[in-house]
Amino acid sequence: MKQIPNLFTLLNLLLGCQALVFILQPGLTVSSNEYGENLVQLPESITWASCCIFGAAIVDFLDGWVARWLKATSALGAQLDSLSDVVSFGVAPGMIAYQFLRYAYASQPDGIDIAEFWLYPAFLLPLAGAYRLARFNTDTPTTSHFVGLPIPAAGILIASFPLVYWFSASAWQIDLLRNPWCWYAIILLCSFLMVSRWPLLAFKFSGGASNRLLIRYVVIILLVTISSCLLLGWLGITIGWVAYLIVSLLHKKLTP
């Protein structure tokens, strides 16, 4: 029974590995039109990578819940969870960012042969995520908030962009994803938030008045996310993610 939570954690890792397969195969499709302009497209399989990362996030939540329910928490499980999270929410989203940077540069007239150096910022995501997890494992645990952005939250944000790319009907959204500087900003923001010590809401319900306040926050964030998804499609996940940051910072500002 004590190994059941670890099986969930290993499923998280398996989904992260499968996401990497979907991201890397078959790679970008590049062709030219009659005017000699590059026509670049990301493979549709990258959307399945997003599904794997979303699935890993669900499993990551369940393994902790199952461990507490079975009273099977262990030091081994904590370390295994961190190692799995680095792959599923660090390396896999980092490779999504890497592929999008390749796509962004390849869409430019002289961008096919861009130096690899310009793609390396994508690796800040797994580096910052690994640092954040190592700090989490060695810091004194807190029950009321996260210290810095949790790596699954960063991974989910990055994983939403392939769905925006493939299922968005808005040209301006595609133009944003085709802009390498937009990607650099996203990568730097996520990496900074992960290594920061900003207190962000953990939504750990402990009873009393704090529960009622957390429920209100959850309702606000869900309403913003759902309404944004109805208006903007998958880009609504980004809006909901920003709403989570704003609510967290306002909570810290307003709470004595």
Q: Model-derived features: where do they sit?
A:
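Topogenic membrane-insertion module of multi-pass membrane proteins
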Residues: 1-61, 239-240, 244, 251, ...
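Interhelical loop and helix-boundary elements at the membrane-water interface
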Residues: 1-13, 66-86, 133-153, 199-214, ...
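Hydrophobic alpha-helical transmembrane segments of polytopic
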Residues: 8-11, 49-53, 121-128, 154, ...
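Alpha-helical transmembrane segments of polytopic integral membrane proteins
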Residues: 17-20, 55, 59, 93, ...
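Membrane-interfacial alpha-helical segments at the cytosolic side of multi-pass membrane proteins
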Residues: 17-25, 90-100, 157-164
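Interfacial loop-to-helix junctions that mark the boundaries of transmembrane helices
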Residues: 36-45, 109-118, 146, 173-181
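Multi-pass membrane catalytic core of lipid/isoprenoid biosynthesis enzymes
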Residues: 44, 51, 69-133
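C-terminal membrane-associated helical module and adjoining short loops/tails
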Residues: 143-256
